[in-house]
């Protein structure tokens, strides 16, 4: 009996756990240690710093089932998804890793045992082929002599990508750094499927499918191309869960495995599709996985960076739903079936289900408004096309006006055997980006160029003053040996009490001083394992290896501490009042206020805001100790500690506890007791994106200052209404009631005035070819009264064409009324359009009533004078 996808995932982890590997949870799809990476796209991403020697773990062997997304950037499978058997935007990468522990012998034997042992995957040995790098005799001999793979099924692959070490079987992290040969394992589906072995002319066929890649990191590539042996070689492996599931379930397409069969059935159910072989069903089944997990990991649809890639995937899925005949929003309805088929791998997604569904529903509703119009425009453009390529300007207009990502446009074109001029599209996009850059006025960010190899010891939990040594200096992003008075720079110390911005908490400010120099620190940032003090040297000269006294601005730090502790209380209070679906999605903690973003699908009600505020203040009054404890990450999770969105955690984590109310992982600085916070007041509650709410609040001195401001404001209002704070509501209510009464009386007077004006105007109507025409410019008449006057004049004149105008604030207001018996010859909308264009405006309306505005007051008399001739020509 074949294994389910969930059973295969668990079996892989169980196997390597039995071989002494630490089972490590999947990291977020948003990489937290690699700004060059759009999404997590391989199992090794979360261990990159370990392989680079910048991070250490408590274990030397690890195994994971890593969520991955490949859409956008270098790794972009989007256009192929749904059209091939194995392309996905989202997949799970099974992997085992050795950090200087075992190497080729164990890595190869582990893989072979898992794949072929009766206890595990029990694949036929004769169905497995392997490749090695051309000069990797060690790996070749292990496969041939120890494992026993016949020589004819071991293929050496050389440099087949146009350069030294540029090979399918040589892995490189970058132009420099760790690299090494790799060995890939292929499964032979049999001669009933076209394709040849790897390295052959037919290797792109579907007969021989790569199921596992084993990378042997044994070299450190230098900038001159030299390969130096690593002192501790490592292993990084990756096996696509969906691919191995297809093999073990005896199917040839990933979309035929149990997980996708169930998802495709769910897609058919919510869209009403009946043809289960439709490629659109595959597209949607794939896309709900990437979209749901990306949103769960904190990505929100937008027009830039990760948010734009997410929006592209969502909109591609919606378009395919449209092709299937979906008549209403459907995509969000697939989150629940996805959670069901993913099982334990969707535990975090399940906690965020309501928020994810709301984000998807909102995005679909927004796109539905422009989808049909955009498709109609695209159909029209394609019908006029003489060649086989849609121009880039049209593709850009579809993007800019109708929200069509270029790959969606390309999808539609591909279905008609047409192409898109993507180079032309990029030119139009770049022109728009250039305009945006020019209007923004932003300059270069030199700090983003800084790379620091050394580490800084942070002492700020216990100290606000520290003796330290300068280990590095950076000016305009470049390392220098010294800086001089007046120069802006970044100073790195061997140890520091300054907190580097992270976890939503801003960096510290203060001074670095010695006998001859003073450096004013205006911000503190992290650069890898180093802490950089950003600022300006106000006096003297500062050199590398100089000693300094690091002095944190204590008053500012204390205010930040209170605000940070309050965010923890706020988070717990929100979960208590709104529900456990609430999760932190971002924060800002500075010395003035705190800002907290969280997942919730609707605006908070006033009574909920009051409950949250009261609950936080109750915990402040309890004056609970704020305690920290360092423990294993898994132990912290078992304790119920909540993790901060988007933050990277080591194996040893700092757990912050506030009595029995709040337990979170946090590396920030905090109050000693909750009572130190003093007072908590919410300023605003608002929405930032679909499914994301934001609270801004103040604490301590800031909260008291707010109370004073509000009290002063109440006193001012009380003085204005001649009352006091105790009867203020009654006094304001009385003022409002009197104001409404006076407004009604004023309106009655205006109506009477309009009636009198209308009565006097009716006598000035002219007969034009037997039709009454009344044209008048009125003074001291509000524009909104013109309509009432036209209605009165129609009643008085019986059959007539009426044109009234007035001016106010250098603007012209026009109205034309035509009685219904005359609209066959004169239409109000046509007449007013002619008048409006003469006064620099435009307008329109019904045949019997139309309004317009203009900006050229001086042209109004001539424009009104032209009406008589215009009407006469039509009568």
Swiss-Prot record:
Instruction: Quote the cellular component terms of the Gene Ontology held in the record.
Output: cytosol
Q: What is its EC number?
A: 6.1.1.7
An example Gene Ontology biological process: alanyl-tRNA aminoacylation
The UniProt record lists the keyword DNA repair: no
CC cofactor: Zn(2+)
Gene Ontology terms for molecular function: alanine-tRNA ligase activity; aminoacyl-tRNA deacylase activity; ATP binding; tRNA binding; zinc ion binding
- The residues listed in the UniProt record as binding Zn(2+), with positions renumbered to this chain, are 564, 568, 666, 670
Protein's cellular compartments: Cytoplasm
Signal peptide location: none
Q: Which CDD domains match?
A: AlaRS_core
One Pfam family here: tRNA_SAD
How many cofactors are bound and how? Binds 1 zinc ion per subunit.
Which terms are listed as keywords in the entry?
Answer: Aminoacyl-tRNA synthetase, ATP-binding, Cytoplasm, Ligase, Metal-binding, Nucleotide-binding, Protein biosynthesis, RNA-binding, tRNA-binding, Zinc
Superkingdom of this protein's organism: Bacteria
Catalytic reactions of this protein: tRNA(Ala) + L-alanine + ATP = L-alanyl-tRNA(Ala) + AMP + diphosphate
The task this protein performs is described as:
Catalyzes the attachment of alanine to tRNA(Ala) in a two-step reaction: alanine is first activated by ATP to form Ala-AMP and then transferred to the acceptor end of tRNA(Ala). Also edits incorrectly charged Ser-tRNA(Ala) and Gly-tRNA(Ala) via its editing domain.
In terms of HAMAP family, this protein maps to: Ala_tRNA_synth_B (MF_00036_B)
Domain free text: Consists of three domains; the N-terminal catalytic domain, the editing domain and the C-terminal C-Ala domain. The editing domain removes incorrectly charged amino acids, while the C-Ala domain, along with tRNA(Ala), serves as a bridge to cooperatively bring together the editing and aminoacylation centers thus stimulating deacylation of misacylated tRNAs.
Q: How does it assemble?
A: Homotetramer.
Q: Which family does it belong to?
A: Belongs to the class-II aminoacyl-tRNA synthetase family.
Q: What is this protein called?
A: Alanine--tRNA ligase
